[in-house]
Amino acid sequence: MADFLAPKSNTHATISSRFQRVQAEGRLALMPFLMAGDPDLETTAEVLLSLEQSGADMIELGIPYSDPLADGPVIQAAASRALASGTTPARVLQMLIDLRGKLSIPVILFTYTNPLFNRGMERFCDEAAEAGVAGLVVPDLPLEEAERLSPLASARGLDLVLLVAPTTPAERMARIAESSRGFTYLVSVTGVTGERSVMEDRVQSLVQQLKLSGSNPVAVGFGISGPQQVRQVRSWGADGAIVGSALVKRMAAAAPGLVAQEAGLFCKELRNAAG
């Protein structure tokens, strides 16, 4: 593929404006995750549009990486399929450029530090902003490195979203909540991504703790497998629910040509549970 092409200014909604809209409607923000390039970027583009049409408020889009330490087997397999189809960060960004004018909800890139540092933090942020990306999630980025990246991202209109785990010490949790932009990402389980039939009850108290620690909305991810967990997250007082492995699994099981349709049907089920 040709080198990255820079388009005109960002036309997507911001993360903050979307949360404000959702909160005004008195419901939970639905934030599906999918892996870019699984099974190919053409299908990814179709799924992104289907998710928006089916009620998604924001979309977390994974950039495939060969050693995804935070991901469970479902998303690892999706990353492997995406890499096998020739997906690269540049191609993912070009796909988003091609969707300009069609996709209006915020897109948040989920990437590991290796692709980010290989491209260079400033260059990566420049290109993400030009592609209309609203934010970044970098799960293996230490807080100290995040404090270097966040100003670079903010200067380009990107929110660097930071993660908090159930095992994060209270003092560090407060620092993360204060430093995160857009929202604070609360990991609901200890371990890697993946569906869980039951989520830890302690997460409910962590939601409230994070809300007291900063002004950001709190979105819960990792382990949300369906509408029941979405309703549970809503009852805890969280502002958003991120659903990844369950959606990726549904897409992988769909018949060729029906992936976007299947993703949209599942998204509608989740949106109904979100309020």
Swiss-Prot record:
Pathway: Amino-acid biosynthesis; L-tryptophan biosynthesis; L-tryptophan from chorismate: step 5/5. It is an enzyme of class 4 (lyase). It catalyses: (1S,2R)-1-C-(indol-3-yl)glycerol 3-phosphate + L-serine = D-glyceraldehyde 3-phosphate + L-tryptophan + H2O. The keyword Hydrolase does not apply. GO terms for cellular component: cytosol. It holds the Pfam family Trp_syntA. Signal peptide: none annotated. The keyword Amino-acid biosynthesis applies. Its EC number is 4.2.1.20. GO terms for molecular function: tryptophan synthase activity. Keywords: Amino-acid biosynthesis, Aromatic amino acid biosynthesis, Lyase, Tryptophan biosynthesis. It comes from the Bacteria. The active site is at 60 (proton acceptor), 71 (proton acceptor). PANTHER family: TRYPTOPHAN SYNTHASE ALPHA CHAIN, CHLOROPLASTIC, TRYPTOPHAN SYNTHASE, ALPHA CHAIN. Tetramer of two alpha and two beta chains. The alpha subunit is responsible for the aldol cleavage of indoleglycerol phosphate to indole and glyceraldehyde 3-phosphate. Belongs to the TrpA family. This is Tryptophan synthase alpha chain. It comes from Prochlorococcus marinus (strain MIT 9313). The lineage of its organism: Bacteria, Bacillati, Cyanobacteriota, Cyanophyceae, Synechococcales. The gene is trpA.
